[in-house]
Amino acid sequence: MNNLSSQNIGTSLDFQESPGEFEEEEEREEDDSSEISSLPPLTQVATASPRMIVSPKMQNIHLIIQNEDNDSSEVNTPHEDWHANLGLGIQSQPLRNERNVEEHYRTRAKRQTILWAENQAEEDTMTQERVRAEAELQVKFEGARAKAEARAEAEASSRAGLSTGVNGANRTVEDTKSTGEQDEMTRKTAERERRLRAEKERLLIEEDARKKAVQVKLEKEKEEEEEGKAAAGRTTAAPETPEDQEAQRIAVEIVQGIYKKISHTEYANFLGTKENHRILKRFIILLEPLPNSLVLSLYKLVTRIYFIAEAQAIDRILEELSIRWTTTNPATHWGSHYNLCHIVLFSLLILNSDLHNAENNQPKFSKEEFTENTLFAVEKESSKSNFDLAQHEPGIREELGVYYEALKYMSLPLLKKDENKTNVRDSRDSKDTRIRIRRRNSKMSTRSQLNNSTENSSSDDDTSVISSSSPSARREPHYTSNWKFHHNKPLPRLYRKEPLDEVFVFSNGTSWCVDSGIKMNERDLASSSNNKSTAQRTTRSRIPSSAGGIFRWITRSKSKSLLHGNKSPVAFFDGNTKWINVRCRVCEGRIYVFKHYPPSMGPQNSMQDLDGMKKASDVYFVCSLYESLATLVQDNVVVNNNHEPSRRGDLDQRGNFTVIIPASLHRKKTLLEFQTSNVEEAQRFVQCVNFWAARLTPVPTAQFEIVSNEENGWSPRVLSGDLPIETLETLYLSDWRPLLSISHLYSEQENSTEETNMVDKIEVLESFAEYLQRTIDSHNTVKPLMISRWRRTRNFERAMDNWNKKYLYLNELNERTSVYLNALQLAQRSVKH
């Protein structure tokens, strides 16, 4: 302040005021300074409050202010005197010298310093209070935390003590228990764990079955959505593809009975073919809504179409009906197990035939027998699909009883024919002399077919809608080939072509072909041939179809044995047997026999045209080898009167073999007897015949009998020993015979020969041979039980005779299977070598 220049002071804004203002301001400043000087010292103010804490900084400021006050008091003494004496001197410009300015600023700085010190003291006081409050809060927090930790430690210590006490008490109690009580507790614990495991396994099985059922249902729904759903009386979305549209159109026309391409009597066969499955699905959908009763659903089905067809077609229709029924009726005790509903539907068909077939002379099914037999079949199938039969058995029994009563008084209209639905083709069908010959198939082992002879065949057989719709070869009745060959009709291919067939099919002397001049029993040729003099009388009127309707294929075989007829190969041992020279060719699944002159012996040209051979023969016949069986009789045969000495002077060693042609519906089995120049040639014929028979003949199913109410002597109720002797004495025993002939046992489809190759056929035959062996062993096990149950009754001989018949039948079938298997294996080995 002392260094300020006079020039700067004179030009300062503070000194540009009007005259008189400076004096007034100075008076005010003096008044303020007097007031300030009258205040107590800063140290007194700072220490007056007991809560004030004066920092060292504040003490230094106080000392500075105090020193300035002392200096001010010394300097202001002359000024005060000057002010008192010269009250108007403030208006005089000369009095405003540098000293006055310096005093003014010193006073002003002192006042500001005092104000700043006071503010700083207040701030320090507030800060101190806040710090003290925070300190007190921290102390309280630390105390609370310490108390909480102490309480937690106390609780932990208490729990540890309590646990120790409980454990000690438990140990004390356990020590006081006896060994027997401990064993009892262990046993109960183990039993409880076992029950829990069993319950867990049961739940897992149920869950798995539920998931599978849901998956099957979802797959069905997805498939139905893709193909489109059509219901009677309501509009549905059009199928996506032209094939779907065509299938929908045909299904609607079949339901309405106006489909013109086939007779209405062939609708069931048409729907049941594999290639028409898409049409079948839409046909079943058009039957909706399906009743919640299986018998009523079946009744609705058979009133829509003429339900006389092949077993295979019926089986497929019933299967699709079962699938659709379980889908639309999911709340029944059958759930999603359509395969069980399929069994029930087939049982209902069999029951209907049993109750209402006038030609059935067997005892009728009772309600109990029908129920027990159907439940037996359901039980076998339910074990494969996780169906709890025990849980639903009461309801199923009641349901089957209702079905029995319904069919007892309301037969299924299987033979119903609506004259209003006939079409142009019906008139020709009414005069047709054919009986359709097709292969049968059923999952309930109701496999069947209708066989017929030459007289009951027609070339139209192979131009039907069903056969023409399939590109595969169909089964041909044994003597249909003869009729076609005689009337110059083309012979269809009977087998599936394989690469080896192209090489060996006409290779003479192999498993594929044998063509040679041999001898044949003249009686066999006369009974088998279809010569020119009788050819015009081969067509007869059609045999009525009243012999059983759809269940004609359930009728029993009339032969005494399944594989052997009344005729035996005695010609080889009969010196009076007349042998004639014939040319025999075995090729492409058929056997051709020609009698012509001049006779030729030994191997022939297997490539020679058959028409030329036929023209050169006065007697001939052709037969398919389906189900046939060739047998080498013996290596050395007793020589007859026509023997010739050999060059060595010994008797010729001729070969002899037979060929059995199975029986058809109206024809007995045929036994053909042949004689060759040597055993090796006979062996080649036997191998070739059995090779083609094995390729053409489907493998029998694994189950041979349908649901039957007959008692043959080994039913479970008899073997259980629960029946008293009196009941066994009065029990009616039926004579055991195969329910179905061997041709009725096959599960192959109509085009099966197109689907099974040699390698697969060998594997299937091997599996079936093993099954037959197990079946024979199982049948042997019941013999001791039968003896113990029947030996004291008058039915003993009859029961054991039934057992023996079935045993012989199984052994014959086993022998036949082994022959077919060996023939295929031999052909396979010959190709490899």
Curated annotation (Swiss-Prot):
Residues 185-410 form the SEC7 domain. InterPro entries: PH_GEF_YEL1, Sec7_C_sf, Sec7_dom, Sec7_dom_sf. GO terms for molecular function: guanyl-nucleotide exchange factor activity. Pfam families: PH_GEF_YEL1, Sec7. Residues 1-51, 152-194, 215-246, 420-483 are annotated as: Disordered. Residues 172-194, 420-435 have a biased composition (Basic and acidic residues). The keyword Membrane applies. GO terms for cellular component: cellular bud neck; cellular bud tip; cytoplasm; plasma membrane. Keywords: Cell membrane, Cytoplasm, Guanine-nucleotide releasing factor, Membrane. Residues 230-240 have a biased composition (Low complexity). It is a peripheral membrane protein. Residues 1-15 have a biased composition (Polar residues). Its main location: cytoplasm. One of its GO terms (biological process) is regulation of ARF protein signal transduction. It is found in: Cytoplasm; Cell membrane; Bud neck; Bud tip. The keyword Transport does not apply. It comes from the Eukaryota. Residues 20-34 have a biased composition (Acidic residues). Residues 548-696 form the PH domain. Belongs to the YEL1 family. Guanine nucleotide exchange factor for ARF3 required for localization of ARF3 to the bud neck and tip and involved in actin patch polarization. This is Guanine-nucleotide exchange factor YEL1. The lineage of its organism: Eukaryota, Fungi, Dikarya, Ascomycota, Saccharomycotina.
